[in-house]
Amino acid sequence: MLFRSWLPSSMRHRTLSSSPALWASIPCPRSELRLDLVLASGQSFRWKEQSPAHWSGVLADQVWTLTQTEDQLYCTVYRGDDSQVSRPTLEELETLHKYFQLDVSLAQLYSHWASVDSHFQRVAQKFQGVRLLRQDPTECLFSFICSSNNNIARITGMVERLCQAFGPRLIQLDDVTYHGFPNLHALAGPEAETHLRKLGLGYRARYVRASAKAILEEQGGPAWLQQLRVAPYEEAHKALCTLPGVGAKVADCICLMALDKPQAVPVDVHVWQIAHRDYGWHPKTSQAKGPSPLANKELGNFFRNLWGPYAGWAQAVLFSADLRQPSLSREPPAKRKKGSKRPEG
């Protein structure tokens, strides 16, 4: 503790109270964004609460700390050079604004979802402020390749070790060293799979290297992933599924969280259970008793018909609630609002 107490302020994690001059803010009520619900819910795996209500992580190859009050989102940026110690620039604030997609009104979306779905209305009362991040497609792709048959804690560890081994070193704060996300060439290197296995990625190591090589050698590089942002949802989903280690669920995660496809509904065991338990949903096109490609597509259509073009965002609210308070959902299947359209599978 003595060592940490003597670190210069430029080498320590900041808090809003300890260095207010180095922070800037964006008007943003908690009903539009709850950092604790968004940054620790399995969207990104690179944010940690380093001090109470202060979240630190890497965004756009810079290290940030975020916190919030009832009506403001605060941020500070560590640039790695004492001569550049200053509050975030307008450009950096714009980066944060785009990352949280703050141009999308959660109030309007929640109001619509509650008007057509009584179950959502009940759950949302305690889970305001859940929104989708707009992540870098490369980081999102390889993070979710690591998510196969995994949980949030283990995925977080895998992604962190991957960044430490293959990503550029950015800065050390207290006893934490931050790294940027690796580029495709680093992940496609001849020794990458062996190294990734030693880091605990298991069979996913082969998929990480193979997908990096496929993008570089068959698709022309990272620009291909960026171009999928403007492709139709079905086209982008199909293209992602050609990559090693990317199935329908992982492709939907990438579409939703990195490729501007808010209608994408990733289906895993949690979402399947929510649909079965809280909506009385059963697949009509297959006999599947759990997630499968055909049944997952049917379930995605069910939720898209119910919630509309931002169905993936609504699903994220229920997913976040189910992770934290599954008892909220242990009631008879939801009744739709009188007069609302009954979705079809």
Swiss-Prot record:
Highest rank taxon of the organism: Eukaryota
Classification via PANTHER family: 8-OXOGUANINE DNA GLYCOSYLASE, N-GLYCOSYLASE_DNA LYASE
The protein's name: N-glycosylase/DNA lyase
Any Gene Ontology CC annotation: nuclear matrix
Family: Belongs to the type-1 OGG1 family.
Gene for this chain: Ogg1
Keyword Hydrolase (UniProt): yes
Catalytic residues as annotated in Swiss-Prot or TrEMBL: K249 (schiff-base intermediate with dna)
Matching InterPro entries: DNA_glycosylase (IPR011257), HhH-GPD_domain (IPR003265), HhH_base_excis_C (IPR023170), Ogg1 (IPR004577), OGG_N (IPR012904), Oxidative_DNA_repair_enzyme (IPR052054)
Keywords, comma-separated and alphabetical: DNA damage, DNA repair, Glycosidase, Hydrolase, Lyase, Multifunctional enzyme, Nucleus
Organism this protein belongs to: Mus musculus
GO BP terms: base-excision repair; cellular response to reactive oxygen species; DNA damage response; DNA repair; negative regulation of double-strand break repair via single-strand annealing; nucleotide-excision repair; positive regulation of gene expression via chromosomal CpG island demethylation; positive regulation of transcription by RNA polymerase II
Record-level Gene Ontology MF annotations: 8-oxo-7,8-dihydroguanine DNA N-glycosylase activity; class I DNA-(apurinic or apyrimidinic site) endonuclease activity; DNA binding; DNA N-glycosylase activity; enzyme binding; microtubule binding; oxidized base lesion DNA N-glycosylase activity; oxidized purine DNA binding
Biological role stated in the UniProt entry: DNA repair enzyme that incises DNA at 8-oxoG residues. Excises 7,8-dihydro-8-oxoguanine and 2,6-diamino-4-hydroxy-5-N-methylformamidopyrimidine (FAPY) from damaged DNA. Has a beta-lyase activity that nicks DNA 3' to the lesion.
Keyword Ubl conjugation: no
Binding annotation for DNA: N149, R154, R204, H270, Q287
